[in-house]
Design a protein with these regions (language model features):
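Bacterial N-terminal signal peptides that target proteins for export
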Residues: 1-9
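Bacterial N-terminal signal peptides
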Residues: 9-19
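Sec/Tat signal peptide C-region and signal peptidase I cleavage site
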Residues: 20-26
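Terminal connector regions
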Residues: 26, 110-160
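Short, solvent-exposed loop/turn segments enriched in Ser/Thr/Gly
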Residues: 52-59, 117
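Asparagine-centered strand-capping/turn motif at beta-strand->loop junctions
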Residues: 62-69
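Short, hydrophobic/aromatic beta-strand segments
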Residues: 69-76, 87-89, 131-135
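Intrinsically disordered, low-complexity Pro/Gly/Ser/Thr-rich segments with frequent PxxP/GP/PP motifs
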Residues: 80-118
C-alpha cells in the first residue's frame, strides 16, 4: 500500500509542478490582415506502371474561422500545371461573414489543370483576424476503388 502511495504522490507532483504551457497545444494564435495563398489542386494523379491518369474532382474550400470579423476574398484564380491562368473565378471581392465558408468545384471530367494545377487565393480584412483555412479536397472513384485527400494552402505573400 505504501509503495502505491509513493507512486501516486510522484505522479501528482509531476502533474502539479509541470508548467501549464507544456500542456497547451498552441498558446499563440496567428492573426493577420490578409495573405496571398498558393493551394495545390490535383485534377488527376497517376497510377500503375503505365502511369494511367486517375481523374479527380477538386473542391476548393475557403473557411473564415474568425468568430467575430468578416474577410474579403479579393483574388481567386485557377492555374494549370505549366503556370498558365485557366480561370479567374471572381471579378469583384466576395465577403465571407464570421464562420462562413465558400467552395468551388472543378468537375472530375475537367482535365485542363493537370496534375500540377493550383489556385491562388488572396484575402483581406480591416482588422487582424484568425487566418482562414484554405484547402483543396480531391476525391475520385474508379471501378471499386476510391481515393480522397486534402492539400492545405501555403502563404506566399503576407499583407501589411
Amino acid at each position: 500500500m505504501t509503495k502505491s502511495l509513493k507512486y501516486l504522490f510522484i505522479l501528482l507532483s509531476i502533474c502539479l509542478f509541470t508548467p501549464f504551457s507544456l500542456y497547451a497545444v498552441d498558446d499563440k494564435i496567428d492573426l493577420s490582415k490578409g495573405q496571398r495563398m498558393y493551394v495545390p489542386a490535383y485534377s488527376h494523379i497517376y497510377s500503375g506502371s503505365k502511369e494511367r491518369p486517375f481523374l479527380l474532382t477538386v473542391t476548393l474550400s475557403i473557411r473564415n474561422i474568425d468568430p467575430t470579423h468578416l474577410i474579403k476574398i479579393t483574388l481567386f484564380d485557377y492555374y494549370e500545371t505549366q503556370g498558365k491562368l485557366l480561370k479567374k473565378y471572381i471579378d469583384k471581392p466576395v465577403t465571407l461573414n464570421p464562420l462562413e465558408s465558400l467552395r468551388y468545384v472543378i468537375p472530375e471530367k475537367d482535365k485542363s489543370g493537370g496534375s500540377g494545377a493550383n489556385f491562388i487565393v488572396e484575402w483581406h480584412s480591416d482588422k487582424p483576424v484568425n487566418q482562414p483555412i484554405i484547402e483543396s479536397i480531391m476525391i475520385g472513384t474508379k471501378s471499386s476503388q476510391g481515393i480522397s485527400f486534402t492539400s492545405r494552402g501555403r502563404e506566399i505573400i503576407a499583407s501589411e
